[in-house]
Amino acid sequence: MRARHITAVVATCTYLITGAPAIAQSDDSQSDDESISLPARATPDAKTPTSKKPESASDWQIRPRWRVQYDVANLTGPAGLPGTGDLQDIRRARVGVDLTMPHGLAARLETELTTDPIELTDAYLQWSDKRFKVILGQQKAQLPLDEENSNLNISFLERAAFVSAFGYSRRTGISGHYVKGDWAISGGVYTDPLILLNDVATNSSSVDLRTYWSPQFASAKFHLGASYHWRDLNDFGIATTRYRSRPALRITDTRYIGTPALDVEKEQRFGLEAAAVRGRFHVAAEAHWLKAQRDRLDDPTFFGAYAEMGVFLTKDSRPLKGGLFGAIKPHKPVGGGGLGAVQLNLRYDHLDLNSGNIVGGKQDGYLASLIWTPAENFRLMGQFAQLNYSDAAIAVAGNRSYSVDVLGVRGQISF
């Protein structure tokens, strides 16, 4: 099955690089997981403001999109710890298309080729104007800053541990977005991902909100935000809900921190986020709490947080706009008189899955990454992480407190 996926990835990439038909392209850089940017509309004739003009050809555009990320890693820990050793795999291989239409309409369809069966990641219809936007279909809900950032633009191989542990993901529903100056708010009503919409009677339902303020002061750009999530799991999560996270890698199935199966009926998540960029430097931090509500049992509360800082060794900067970090455009790319963009990042990553009589473990992670972006569509990442566990889900010779070291490299190409 893996061979079939690799063959599909290679064939698709070869077609898009060498044989794809001519398509319309936008000059505006767009983070891969952002909603679709619409082409500029023609300005009406000032002398006849009420006259209607035919839609221009630029109002209809179709753009293929794809990415491939390949990871190679080594995981070490105490003797006898499962999951250690050398690892390599395709992290992501996605192919999709963006369609922009007249009257502010747009659509996106994208698939992930590495899953079995192949899954849809984005599948939605969008309408927008200068301040408002409505999205219908499978999409990113109102998520933490680290998850809102495209996986093409994150600082490390994976996002913060709480993002995967608390189950932040794409879901099916309808959302509304409003922007006014430096302030924005968005909210949505959702159910499960498309692949799980097999029985309406057992589907979960949720309400999600996110707001942020992103002012500019002198030469520094700031971001302050908050988010809220309420979810009724219905029959979806009864006696099967687990909160757990992998060790700073997605290409391993081993998890050293995780709760037992819990009979969760509803859950709430609260989050705070902050970030700033000034020239070559950036900082970002988030804190999130998850409260799991159970029938006739104590309601545990779990916590996750991270803080990171980064600096470019070249004359580049990390864009912070629209409530997320955008793609890096090297000031002097390879082939354009330079070496591309080189960035160094440090992060502290904390996850606490202990609450009352529930012991899921604690993780304190210390991570460093070096990222080389020779051109906008290419990236090479190197990462080292030391993860310190206590009350770990997996014991080694009866010991549940130990450290794991993770060394990983990722090659990435996108279009």
Where are these regions (language model features)?
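Cleavable N-terminal export/targeting peptides
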Residues: M1-T43
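General helical secondary-structure elements
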Residues: M1, V9, P21, S37, ...
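Short, intrinsically disordered low-complexity segments
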Residues: M1-A3, S29, A40, A46, ...
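Outer membrane beta-barrel
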Residues: S51-N234, F303-Y306, V311-G336, Q343-N345, ...
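Outer-membrane beta-barrel pore domains
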Residues: D27-L38, A57, L81-P82, A239-F415
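Acidic, proline-/serine-/threonine-rich low-complexity intrinsically disordered repeat tracts
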Residues: D45-S51
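Intrinsic disorder/low-complexity detector
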Residues: T7, S29-Q30, E34-S35, K47, ...
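Domain-scale selection of a single, long terminal region
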Residues: M1-C13, S204-R210, F217-F236, A261-Q293, ...
